[in-house]
């Protein structure tokens, strides 16, 4: 039996949730492995359009997350909740 609580993929560095009108977008950084990070962007009204981008360093993932956050704010989205 695998203990998923110890899997690297279960580790979320941070998660931000944005909203605009009646829609929400979640953008998070999570560890994919010991040396791989993912930036996950999910429009919560259509999770089938989720995007996952992989990076070899947390610094690259943080930069991408910041760029996405900037783009969302510039498009009128508001930060509603965050963790991390």
Model-derived segments and spans:
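A short, exposed loop/beta-hairpin motif centered on an aromatic-Gly-Thr core
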Residues: 46-63
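Short, surface-exposed linear segments at secondary-structure transitions and domain or protein termini
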Residues: 35-39, 59-67
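Short aromatic-glycine-(Arg/Gly/Cys) micro-motifs in beta-strand/loop hairpins
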Residues: 25-51, 82
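Short, mixed-charge low-complexity intrinsically disordered segments
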Residues: 20, 24-29, 62, 71-84
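Intrinsically disordered, low-complexity regions
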Residues: 1-7, 83
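Basic K/R-rich, polyanion-interacting modules in nucleoproteins and related proteins
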Residues: 1, 15-19
């Amino acid at each position: 039996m695998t203990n998923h609580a110890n899997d690297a993929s279960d580790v979320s560095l941070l998660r931000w949730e944005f909203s605009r009108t009646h829609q929400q977008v979640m953008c998070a950084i999570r560890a994919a492995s010991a040396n791989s990070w993912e930036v996950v962007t999910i429009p919560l009204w259509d999770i089938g359009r989720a995007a996952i981008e992989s990076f070899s360093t947390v610094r690259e993932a943080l930069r991408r997350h910041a760029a996405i956050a900037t783009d969302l704010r510039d498009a009128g989205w508001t930060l509603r909740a965050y963790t991390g």
